[in-house]
């Protein structure tokens, strides 16, 4: 149904970049990554390195204006780095080369940047990379938790489909996004591929990397290929994540709050909770609030205020519009997660 961006799988790919990207090039990356890759990219062909500090659109506008002249941009990192690289490429109208360093999200394969405006996620801009370079050794060397968390952006298809089917059944479809079984089926194939490779993804084998990144490749591209339609790939589980992020002011490893949201959405729909909890636990994504650096009180507040949040943010229709999160829902979500992962034991 969609081909996605040109994607190159291999090894020693970062060191080759200075030999062919347009010069001078800007590297967009993170503080913790640059020391590792600077020897491969720093040199006479580099215009500058930008270390991402913010995803706020108003701040990024000024940052992009102040960056030095460059002929291309290399996005090197996880979701934040590649999203900012897309934004720079779009604003400067220059070629883009993406190098994900972990499998955390599908951002390297998406056209728009997931940024923040007034604390709410907004997808802005449009950039198509010359290629996405997936280096097996680079990915495998990332913290295992980051790589495993990438399944959140695929397992979320489960709750997204439940939301879209509910919207159809209630006659509340958005005019631009009528229910499309073909999209649901295509997304389901990617979901099944990841569910069938959970052990390889957990161990970050070449097969696990290829399986999850190919699913991300499809997921990142289909938003545009389906006419900017998010309904088959994102729903209430992401809305919970956005609300938790806004309420706490924290940045999270994407798949952890999304994984928690998948459990919440499954409980609200009354469908597939056991399967989703088992998959998240088996692959090694710890969705307990404490593992994210917050408490159960934060998670509970984000659950209970979800209905108000989706209306305030103008998000598309989901189970959050139809079923309030009451004591029974909160208790079931907590019980399911604690039963699978155990109670949190502080190491302090």
Language model features with spans:
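Solvent-exposed alpha-helices and their adjacent loops that cap or buttress functional pockets
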Residues: 19-20, 65-68, 122-127, 131, ...
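A glycine/threonine-rich phosphate-anchoring loop and its flanking beta-alpha core
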Residues: 90-190
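C-terminal charged capping/lid subdomain of soluble metabolic enzymes
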Residues: 154, 163, 167, 171-173, ...
């Amino acid at each position: 149904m969609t081909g996605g961006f040109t994607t190159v799988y291999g090894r020693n790919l970062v060191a080759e970049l200075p030999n062919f990207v347009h010069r001078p090039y800007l590297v967009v990356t993170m503080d913790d990554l640059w020391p590792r890759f600077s020897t491969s990219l720093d040199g006479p062909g580099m215009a500058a390195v930008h270390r991402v500090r913010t995803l706020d659109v108003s701040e990024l506008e000024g940052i992009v204006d102040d960056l030095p002249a460059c002929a291309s941009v290399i996005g090197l990192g996880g979701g934040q780095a590649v999203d900012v690289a897309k934004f720079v490429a779009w604003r400067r109208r220059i070629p883009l080369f993406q190098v994900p360093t972990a499998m955390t999200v599908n951002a390297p394969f998406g056209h728009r940047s997931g940024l923040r405006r007034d604390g709410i996620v907004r997808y802005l801009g449009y950039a198509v990379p010359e290629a996405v370079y997936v280096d097996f050794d680079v990915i495998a060397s990332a913290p295992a938790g980051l790589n495993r968390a990438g399944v959140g952006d695929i397992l979320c298809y489960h709750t997204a489909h439940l939301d879209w089917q509910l919207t159809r059944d209630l006659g509340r479809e958005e005019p631009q996004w009528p229910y499309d079984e073909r999209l649901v089926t295509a997304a389901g194939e990617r979901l099944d591929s990841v569910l069938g490779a959970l052990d390889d993804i957990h161990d970050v084998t070449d097969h696990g990397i290829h399986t999850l990144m190919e699913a991300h490749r499809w997921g990142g591209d289909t938003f545009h290929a389906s006419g900017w339609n998010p309904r088959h790939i994102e729903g209430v589980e992401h809305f919970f994540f956005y609300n938790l992020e806004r309420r706490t002011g924290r940045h999270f490893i994407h798949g952890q709050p999304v994984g928690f949201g998948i459990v919440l959405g499954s409980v609200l729909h009354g469908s597939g909770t056991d399967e989703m909890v088992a998959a998240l636990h088996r692959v090694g994504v710890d969705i307990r609030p404490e593992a994210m650096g917050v408490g159960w009180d934060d998670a509970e507040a984000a659950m209970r205020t979800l209905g108000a949040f989706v209306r305030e943010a103008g998000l598309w229709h989901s189970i959050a519009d139809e079923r309030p999160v009451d004591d029974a829902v909160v208790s079931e979500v907590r019980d399911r997660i604690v039963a699978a992962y155990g109670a949190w034991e502080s190491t302090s």
